[in-house]
Regions:
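Active-site catalytic motif of lipid deacylating hydrolases and related acyltransferases
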Residues: 2-53, 71-148, 205-213, 232, ...
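Intrinsically disordered, low-complexity segments that are common in secreted/host-exposed effector
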Residues: 8, 35, 41-62, 225-229, ...
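Short beta-strand-to-loop junctions in surface cap/lid or active-site-entrance loops
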Residues: 58-72
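Serine-dependent carboxylesterase/thioesterase catalytic core
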Residues: 131-215
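Lipolytic serine-hydrolase domain surface
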Residues: 176-180, 185-263
Length: 263
């Protein structure tokens, strides 16, 4: 109990320590550029965007569900907070435009900004797994048990969840040699050591990355690629910068090998 209390106080200290970077969460790029999560033209219609905005505030969105077919290579996208099915699809579409991937859903359903933030605290500070995390865990587990190459791309809170999933897989002595994990702006305070491939991408002026992967670099398994950028949005602040190869030592990234030659 004392350890949990100390860990909670440490997380509060870290959150306050980096508050200076909170205003940079939306970066300084054109927020309404093509593929932006904030651009109405990125959605099928205005209603989809308004529903996404509503869901990010108060939740009640249905989880994005699609029949998942186990293939020889399975690529899953695990989103962060305030992401309903419309935003998930927008992110997945941009991932597919950059990489030779057919992305399948590992949808972390939004319950609204406050409940989502509380989930981050419970998951990261107290290492509590909720029902949804277990569901995501079994999806990854099934792919690995069938000896299929399994790639997980995680953003923000998704970094916390995939760290929890990997810890559970390690506890169950699951062979992780076919697992690859790529996180963007991970909010986690760790990534467990194991027999799998892992990479992390972080912007120096992204508040979430600063209180997560950048603050706890020594606790992270896998290479960390750092970009001198602002912003936390996956599409315009991370994937677009990845397209421009503007992360440190990017030539050492295995994820780079999946990029389409025409991008």
């Amino acid at each position: 109990m004392k350890f949990l209390r100390n860990q909670f106080l440490l997380d509060i200290f870290v959150a306050v320590k980096h508050l200076l970077y909170l205003p940079y969460v939306f970066g300084d790029e054109q927020l309404f550029q093509q593929n932006s999560e904030l651009n109405p033209k990125s959605y099928n219609n205005v209603a989809d965007m308004l529903i996404s905005a509503k869901d990010s505030l108060i939740g009640f969105s249905s989880k994005y569900q699609k029949q998942i077919e186990i293939q020889d290579t399975n690529v899953y996208f695990l989103n962060g907070i305030c992401t309903n099915k419309n935003v998930w699809l927008l992110n997945a579409k941009h991932i597919e435009s950059i990489f030779d991937f057919n992305v399948q859903p590992l949808h972390n359903k939004t319950k609204g900004v406050i409940p989502d933030l509380l989930e981050c605290i419970f998951g990261r500070t107290f290492d509590l797994l909720n029902y949804e995390t277990f569901c995501l865990y079994y999806t990854v587990l099934e792919s690995l048990k069938l000896k299929k190459k399994t790639i997980v791309i995680a953003h923000s809170q998704g970094g916390i969840i995939i760290a929890q999933i990997v810890k559970q897989l390690i506890k169950q002595n699951i062979d992780l040699s076919l697992l690859e994990v790529y996180t963007f702006a991970s909010a986690s305070d760790e990534m467990p050591l194991g027999n799998y491939h892992c990479e992390h991408f972080a912007n120096t002026k992204d508040y979430v990355a600063r209180i997560g992967v950048l603050e706890y670099k020594d606790n992270f398994y896998g290479n960390i690629f750092i970009g001198e950028h602002k912003g936390h949005l996956l599409n315009i602040h991370y994937l677009n910068n990845f397209k421009r190869n503007s992360y440190s030592n990017i030539h050492n990234s295995k994820l780079l090998s999946y990029k389409k030659p025409t991008v």
